[in-house]
Amino acid sequence: NLYQFKNMIHCTVPNRSWWHFANYGCYCGRGGSGTPVDDLDRCCQIHDNCYGEAEKISGCWPYIKTYTYDSCQGTLTSCGAANNCAASVCDCDRVAANCFARAPYIDKNYNIDFNARCQ
């Protein structure tokens, strides 16, 4: 779920608050469209698509589904989720949080003009 995703982000990118990722580029935060502006935005596009795939599982709502995962030490290695939905959502979040840790954060891509740059 989004709360657990926030915690995963804090694990992998401890020097930056989760909300820095909530309004970044074309895909981090509110939906998404257009071409990702950079590698970090591409991480968010992949995460959005992953949630879309998880939603195809009957009764799976990624934004609120809880799951378990290994404790954090810089890299999140595995999800301990017990069912397909929880495992899928956890893996979406784990992959994205690790992707965020590898991708450079470019300040000018935070809070961009969505209508002008993301069509």
Swiss-Prot record:
CDD domains, A to Z: PLA2c
Tagged with keyword NADP: no
Localization in the cell: Secreted
Binding annotation for Ca(2+): 27, 29, 31, 48
Pfam families per record: Phospholip_A2_1
Entry's cofactor comment: Binds 1 Ca(2+) ion.
EC number: 3.1.1.4
Highest taxon above the source species: Eukaryota
Residue numbers annotated as active site: 47, 93
A GO term from the CC aspect: extracellular region
Keyword Transit peptide: no
Known cofactor(s): Ca(2+)
GO molecular function ontology, one term from the record: calcium-dependent phospholipase A2 activity
GO biological process, alphabetically ordered: arachidonate secretion; lipid catabolic process; phospholipid metabolic process
Bridged cysteine pairs (disulfide): 11-72, 26-118, 28-44, 43-99, 50-92, 60-85, 79-90
Reaction equation(s) it catalyzes: a 1,2-diacyl-sn-glycero-3-phosphocholine + H2O = a 1-acyl-sn-glycero-3-phosphocholine + a fatty acid + H(+)
Keyword annotations of the record: Calcium, Disulfide bond, Hydrolase, Lipid degradation, Lipid metabolism, Metal-binding, Secreted
Distribution of this protein across tissues and organs: Expressed by the venom gland.
Cited function: PLA2 catalyzes the calcium-dependent hydrolysis of the 2-acyl groups in 3-sn-phosphoglycerides.
Family: Belongs to the phospholipase A2 family. Group I subfamily. D49 sub-subfamily.
Annotated protein name in UniProt: Acidic phospholipase A2 DE-III
Organism of derivation: Naja melanoleuca (Forest cobra)
Classification of source organism: Eukaryota, Metazoa, Chordata, Craniata, Vertebrata
